Amino acid sequence: MNEFFQWVMLHNRPWDTHPPLSDAETEELFELMADPSLDDDAMTIDMADGYMTACAIGPSPVPVHLWLEAIFAQPTLPLPHDPARQQRLLQLLMRRYSDIQAALSVPPADTTVDTLYTPLSSELEEGDCITPHQLNAQGDRIGDWELKYWAEGFRLAVAADDEWAPLLIDPEGAPLLTPVVLYSTGYNPDNPDFQLDAESRTLLPALIGSLYALHDWWRQYRQTHGAHQAHTITPTLVRESPKVGRNDPCP
């Protein structure tokens, strides 16, 4: 049984009535998501943020208990040995998800510095960033770079939901995912001199802009096709490399 479903039912409240997460609360969320007692396959906060962002943008609402199960890689509640930290972690995640929804619902022309969506990203260790880039035998870049795990979380959410298929095959919609793909791969195979590193922020505006454009694409699609339309086409935003666990070395 998915324990997150029961938790959501017991804590069914309007999370958007809370103020946006403060800097201190965001730091607390980072700390809680880094708890070593979480499952090895649980997502990092970066990856979880990307996953939640894709769920908030996507074709139809993803039930909360399902994306929580995906984030923690288990159907049972995290941190069972510490109920207070468990509740705090889940509450902060719910508020972050509400913040994401609120930010992306504002038209780009009306956004301010305070309302603009910004992805969460952990600080990288300089030694983990290998430049110029090197590839492993599977053709994947080795090491870390800016927003790597955020983009991987977004990719996982898209790959898990067949309803993304209309966008993936649309000649105008699919290119909107280009910044996400670039952040996921860390370099451009067609332009090897361009690569992401720990300090580069040059593509961040393009990434954020693409998220608003994706949100608008799906809004228009729902208006034209309805909110709930089944799709059977297999999504193509999938890499063959396995998911990296929170305690696994970087590929």
Region annotations inferred by a language model:
Residues 1-151, 155-251:
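Domain-length accessory/inserted modules outside core catalytic folds
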